[in-house]
């Protein structure tokens, strides 16, 4: 199969000074010229500047040794039951708190022993060590004492490190605790990130014990947000009632205060009347009954709705809700497969949908006009030029799409200006630089300008009206080169290359950058990732994925970047991971039903209501 998408494939001059005999040395004579009779040398520089890179580290090391031996120490810090010896000048240089203490008119400026209260002694020792060594380890066991101590001592760098550590620890079971911790210590950026995480993952957060233990004020802060990520307002009401019933005796007095932030007018009539209106706690509170009546009027009197607009009638607006990810074909258990499955980030579930009519590995996948196209590939025996098209409304594939002019596997596919482009790949004889595009109105493929380089296992992306061909292999070795197609000029031009050679990589456009992840270089599968800034024409690294992934799919779903499947050098993968640009971290977030190498991925909008759902091989409409 050619290159199938399978694993394995300075001195001074010599003149002498005459000062001893009464002579003189002038610039450019003895030292610079090497004496008389020889060829003249350029004059020596009159100044040599040197900056030692070792000096700061060596100096700190020696100062720390003095401290350890209690030499030249001029202050002792009494913290808890511990005495910490130090030098005022070092502490003052590192901490604004100590600088104010020792250089001002405070009593401590004249004391040799100073008592520091309201700070953990272990945290203080770690921070003093940092002042002398520039080294600290932040971990789960100490971050909750280090951060308040760093805030007190005004060690901003340590505050930032602690906040960064806590950002990386965020999950639905602890985000509320981290949020409260950030609020207590005025860590605004950490508070913002924790808020965003809570809003986005509210459906999981509401199941946590931390949620049930929230004070009423913090609960209100969360549920009043427009950015709360929920499938329906029913989830918010159910979350509030779970919180209330955790401690009914103490919390029922707050029901109306909380319920006014649930957007009751956005509930279905059935749920409003049958669940909310019939709840005994709601019915027993006059203010709650008024809120229910307000919602009923909103639903029953549509002509009056323009006059009834307010915070409770405003739909919540999480970023780009309603997208689902399809994983199409690929290589699994030694053979090409036809199976297709769909991932819903709202439920974190994978569901099987109708399979393709042909098995396809190395298939190119893209979405055009709300239809999912599967282009070319290899069925385990033959290279394919056939195309299939999937309609999510009927859960059916059709084969009435014109074939490409060449058989192609390991092909890059993307949509630009209403055309479907097929880029590179291999046809079983050679690696291709051919590019063609499909016009859905004419059901016809036509060739455009070829790339300057042959590329199989190429990744393609569309950004700012241009089509990018990224990496791949020329049939001999992996590439790091990148070229860009301008459809107005029908011309390819080179842009700056990636830092790493990659074939069978994943690629997607995210927040106006092109992300390139995984793939395979000359000798191994890759976990590394990088992104391209078209404004500066530069690539920069991001954190590596948790797994090596060649033949990986990459896609943006509901504003998040997902890496799907691939091959890690020893096994086909069914895991997926998601990238958070705020924390520059990848995290695993579930598994497909099938392991997939070289499968395609595509993103489509889900149906607008929940009356529709995909099942294994059928599409049903429910009357709810």
From Swiss-Prot:
Coiled coil feature spans: none
Source organism superkingdom: Eukaryota
Domain BTB: 73-140
GO biological process, one term: proteasome-mediated ubiquitin-dependent protein catabolic process
InterPro entries: BACK, BTB-kelch_protein, BTB/POZ_dom, Gal_Oxase/kelch_b-propeller, Kelch-typ_b-propeller, Kelch_1, SKP1/BTB/POZ_sf
Kelch repeat locations: 324-370, 372-418, 419-465, 467-512, 514-559, 560-606
SUPFAM superfamilies associated with the record: Galactose oxidase, central domain, Kelch motif, POZ domain
Biased composition (Low complexity): 15-28
DNA damage found in the keyword field: no
Region Disordered, annotated ranges: 1-55
Keywords tagged on the record: Actin-binding, Kelch repeat, Repeat, Ubl conjugation pathway
Presence of keyword 4Fe-4S: no
Transmembrane segments: none
Pfam families: BACK, BTB, Kelch_1
Pathway: Protein modification; protein ubiquitination
PROSITE patterns found in the cross-reference section: BTB
Domain annotation BACK: ranges: 175-277
Gly residues bias: start-end ranges: 29-38
MF terms in GO: actin binding; ubiquitin-like ligase-substrate adaptor activity
GO CC entries: Cul3-RING ubiquitin ligase complex
Function recorded in the entry: Probable substrate-specific adapter of an E3 ubiquitin-protein ligase complex which mediates the ubiquitination and subsequent proteasomal degradation of target proteins. May have a role in synapse differentiation and growth.
Protein name: Kelch-like protein diablo
């Amino acid at each position: 199969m050619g290159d199938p998408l399978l694993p394995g494939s300075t001195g001074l001059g010599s003149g002498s000074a005459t000062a001893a005999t009464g002579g003189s040395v002038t610039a450019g004579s003895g030292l610079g010229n090497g004496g008389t009779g020889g060829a003249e040398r350029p004059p020596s520089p009159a100044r040599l500047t040197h900056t030692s890179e070792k000096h700061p580290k060596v100096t700190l090391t020696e100062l720390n040794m003095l401290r350890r031996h209690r030499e030249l120490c001029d202050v002792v810090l009494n913290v808890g039951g511990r005495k910490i010896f130090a030098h005022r000048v070092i502490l003052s240089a590192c901490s604004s708190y100590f600088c104010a203490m020792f250089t001002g008119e405070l009593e401590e400026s004249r004391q040799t022993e100073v008592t520091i209260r309201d700070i953990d002694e272990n945290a203080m020792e770690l921070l003093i060590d940092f002042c002398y060594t520039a080294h600290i380890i932040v971990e789960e066991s100490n971050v909750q004492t280090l951060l308040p101590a760093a805030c007190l001592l005004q060690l901003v760098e340590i505050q930032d490190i602690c906040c960064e550590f806590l950002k990386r620890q965020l999950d639905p079971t602890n985000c509320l605790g981290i949020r409260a911790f950030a609020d207590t210590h005025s860590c605004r950026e950490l508070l913002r990130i924790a808020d965003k995480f809570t809003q986005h993952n509210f459906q999981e957060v509401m199941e946590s014990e931390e949620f049930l233990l929230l004070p009423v004020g913090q609960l209100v802060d969360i549920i009043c947000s427009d950015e709360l990520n929920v499938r329906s307002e029913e989830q918010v009401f159910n979350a509030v009632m779970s919180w209330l019933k955790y401690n009914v005796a103490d919390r029922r007095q707050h029901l109306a205060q909380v319920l006014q932030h649930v957007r009751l007018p956005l509930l279905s009539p059935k749920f409003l009347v049958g669940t909310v209106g019939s709840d005994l706690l709601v019915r027993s509170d006059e203010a709650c009954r008024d809120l229910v009546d307000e919602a009923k009027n909103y639903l029953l009197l549509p002509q009056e709705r323009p006059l009834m607009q307010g915070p409770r009638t405003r739909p919540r607006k999480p970023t780009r809700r309603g997208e689902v990810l399809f994983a199409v074909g690929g290589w699994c258990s030694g053979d090409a497969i036809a199976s297709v499955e769909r991932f819903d980030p709202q439920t974190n579930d994978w569901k099987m949908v109708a399979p393709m009519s042909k098995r396809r590995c190395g298939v190119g996948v893209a979405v055009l006009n709300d239809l999912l196209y599967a282009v070319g590939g290899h069925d385990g025996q033959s290279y394919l030029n056939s195309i299939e098209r999937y309609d999510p409304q009927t859960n059916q594939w059709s084969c009435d799409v014109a074939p490409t002019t060449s058989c192609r596997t390991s092909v890059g596919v993307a949509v630009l200006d209403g055309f479907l482009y097929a880029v590179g790949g291999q046809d079983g004889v050679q690696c291709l630089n051919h590019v063609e595009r499909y016009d859905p109105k004419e059901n016809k493929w036509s060739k455009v300008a070829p790339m300057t380089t042959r590329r199989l296992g190429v990744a393609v992306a569309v950004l700012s009206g241009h089509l990018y061909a990224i990496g791949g292999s020329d049939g001999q070795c992996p590439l790091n080169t990148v070229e860009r197609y301008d459809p107005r000029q029908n011309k390819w031009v080179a842009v700056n290359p990636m830092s790493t050679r990659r074939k069978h990589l994943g690629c997607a456009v995210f927040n106006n950058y092109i992300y390139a992840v995984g793939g395979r270089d000359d000798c191994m599968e890759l976990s590394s990732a990088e992104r391209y800034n078209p404004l500066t024409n530069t690539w920069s690294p991001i954190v590596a994925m948790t797994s090596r992934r060649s033949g990986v799919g990459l896609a943006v779903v509901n504003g998040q970047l997902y890496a799907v499947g691939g091959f890690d050098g020893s096994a086909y993968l069914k895991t997926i991971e998601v990238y958070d640009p705020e924390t520059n971290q990848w995290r695993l977030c579930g598994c497909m039903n099938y392991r997939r190498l070289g499968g395609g991925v595509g993103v489509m909008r889900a149906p607008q209501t929940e009356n529709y759902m995909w099942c294994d091989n059928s599409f049903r409409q429910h009357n709810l």
